[in-house]
Structures are given as C-alpha cells and as structure tokens.
Regions:
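Short, mixed-charge aromatic SLiMs
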Residues: 64-75, 124-128, 175-181, 217-228, ...
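Well-ordered alpha-helical scaffold segments within catalytic/enzyme domains
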Residues: 1-3, 41-55, 93-111, 155-168, ...
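Hydrophobic core segments within long, regular secondary-structure runs in both alpha-
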Residues: 7-18, 41-44, 53-64, 93-96, ...
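CBM-like carbohydrate-recognition segments
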Residues: 32, 206-209, 226-236, 242-326
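Extended ligand-binding clefts on enzyme/binding-domain cores
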Residues: 12, 113-238
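Structural signature of alpha-solenoid helical repeat scaffolds
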Residues: 4-5, 31, 35, 83, ...
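Helix-terminus loop motifs that line ligand-binding clefts
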Residues: 51-106, 110-111, 117-130, 258-285
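Low-complexity, Ser/Thr/Pro/Gly-enriched N-terminal "stalk/linker" regions
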Residues: 1-38, 46-74, 120, 127, ...
C-alpha cells in the first residue's frame, strides 16, 4: 500500500475534520458542535500527518487554553463551554501524541518549549490518579477519585507516558482483574478492552491476539465494538489495525483496513458504524474522530516498514519501536 495514493484517497476525510473545526480551534464530532478533548487530539494527529499546520496549531492552542490551573481538561465541550464537572485521567496527557506526530513529520527533536510548563503540570497531576500498584483511576470530581480503573483509559495513559519518553510505570499484572472494572461491569464484551493492551505493548503475544480477534472480527466488514452486537465501528476497526500492526499481526491489520475502506461514501467521508443485520449506517453521524482514526491507521500501514527512518513515521509505530528498545 502506497501512502501517496492513500493520502489522496483519504483527503476528503481530512477535509471533513477541518470543516468541523470551530473558530476557537476546537474540533467537533460533527456539525452538532460537541467536542471531546481526547477525540480532538485524535483529529490533531491526522492533521499533523497531512501537514495541515494552521488547523493543527489552532487545535493545539485551543487544547492548552482549556487546561486548567491543575493540569486538567473538561471531558466535553458544547458551544465552546465545558459541559461536565469531572475530569478523566487520560484526556489531558493525550495531547503529547499529536505533538509527537508533528515532531516526526517536521523532523524535530522536542515538543515546542512554550507548552513545556503545561505539559509538566499535566503529568504531575496524572500522578494524583495513580494508586500504589501503578493503576490509574479513570476520573475524579470535587468529591474525589472514582472507585474504578478502566483498561482503555489506563492503556492510553501508558501510551502518553511513552510518548513523553517515560518508562517508569510498572503495573502489577497479577492484580489486573482485581484493579480493572471494579464496578462489576463485564467489559470483556468490548473490543477496545481486548486490543488496547496490545497497542500499549503491555501484551505482545501474536497467537493470543489473533485468537481474541476472532471474537470481534467480521470478515469482510471490520471489527465489532461489542462482541454480541451486529455492529462494526470504523474507529475501533482502525485502532485494532494499529494494535495488530505494532504487535506483528500484519496480515490481520491489512485485512481489517481493506475491509473498512468500502465504507467511504461518495463524498469520501467515513461513517461511525455499520449495523450489518439491518444493513444501515448507525448512528447517523460521520464523526471526525472516526475519519481521523482511518487516516492514522492507513498512514501507519503505509509507513511501518520504514522503521529506520524517524522522519515522517507514524507516532504509534514509532512508540512501539521505542517500547521494544527499552
């Protein structure tokens, strides 16, 4: 797969992201105006890949302008206003991923110095979410920390720490089942809980990956969000492509990515998901972060073989190589 050809094919997906960027720099899910900072960062990674620096820089500035004095950011904005009064542990640290992707494209050696004080504050605050066994509570509000840790949030915290070249984290894996999903909800139903540990390189067994993938992969369509539901989602499929790729399951990554390309519509934009029993796209939205995820996965697939070339490489592939060498 050639990146220049795919870059042209996916350009409308990138343009859709820019079309949904507000004047203040925030990137909405779609025309309805909701902005999730984590998804905003996902879109920034895609913009960095396309070297859309004006939109990228506006988006980065918006993010840091909305970091509070404690190094936290609201989990959702609507009409440029914060919606909730709690904070999620993995949101603020994720900004280092788009910054690192920009570094790789621009062939720079460090994050912009003007953001260093806030980045330091973000990661200092992150320590307040961590327990004695290295696990992170997923959220906190005025009453204190939540009583639960999530695989998804924790894995992206570890990815963000790696992007900052911090490998000091150490999870006591013997307490995995005890620590995660303490609210009693069975999250093994969700594909993200399967593949995120591989993306974070906490797990790395190729055979186990493909075995678990069978529970979620629908051949010819993509990856289901929830095991028992006939619903493939394009973002989860794209993230699973990344996880498979960095884990060495390259054929699986290529198959999934080729499957989801069929869902690009006549305008070149991807839907959020497809309910294959009813043969309908659901929900009725074309989320920007879904289109960003496709771009990131496609770029990774096209460039991962150039592992000796730092410049222009994909941030997730680059981080997986950093993990292997440390």
């Amino acid at each position: 797969m050639n990146w220049e050809d795919l870059r042209t094919k996916l350009k409308p997906a990138k343009d859709w992201i820019i079309l949904n960027q507000l004047e203040d720099g925030s990137i909405s899910w779609d025309q309805r105006g909701k902005c999730d900072p984590w998804d905003h960062c996902e879109c920034l990674i895609a913009l960095a890949i396309y070297e859309e620096w004006d939109a990228f820089d506006k988006g980065v500035d918006w993010f840091f302008n909305n970091i509070n004095k404690d190094g936290l950011i609201s989990p959702e904005f609507k009409n440029q206003q914060s919606v909730y009064n709690h904070f999620e542990s993995h949101h603020a640290p994720y900004i280092v991923l788009p910054l690192m992707q920009a570094m790789l494209i621009r062939d720079e050696e460090s994050f912009p110095k003007e953001y260093s004080p806030q980045i330091n504050k973000i990661f200092d605050q992150l320590e307040n979410f961590k327990d004695d066994d290295g696990y992170y509570y997923w959220a906190k509000d005025k009453k204190g920390l939540s009583d639960n840790s999530l695989i998804t949030a924790t894995m992206y915290i570890l990815i963000s720490l790696t992007a900052r070249h911090e490998r000091s984290f150490n999870l006591d894996l013997s307490k995995w089942d005890q620590k995660f999903d303490r609210d009693g909800t069975d999250r093994s139903r969700f594909s993200m809980d399967f593949y995120y540990p591989y993306l974070a390189r906490v797990k790395n067994n190729k055979q186990e990956f493909d075995k678990h993938l069978e529970e979620f992969y629908v051949k010819g369509l993509g990856v289901k969000c929830v095991k028992e539901q006939p619903w493939v989602t394009i973002a989860e499929s794209s993230e699973c492509v990344l996880a498979a790729l960095v884990n060495g399951n390259v054929t699986s990554a290529e198959n999934i990515f080729n499957d989801i390309l069929q869902f690009q519509d006549s305008a070149g934009i991807f839907p959020t998901g497809y309910q294959y029993d009813l043969k309908i796209f659901w929900p009725e939205e074309k989320s920007t972060w879904t289109n960003a995820a496709v771009i990131i996965a496609g770029h990774a697939l096209c460039t991962f073989k150039d592992i000796n070339e730092r410049k222009g490489s994909n941030v997730f592939v680059n981080l997986s190589n950093f993990n292997k060498s440390n």
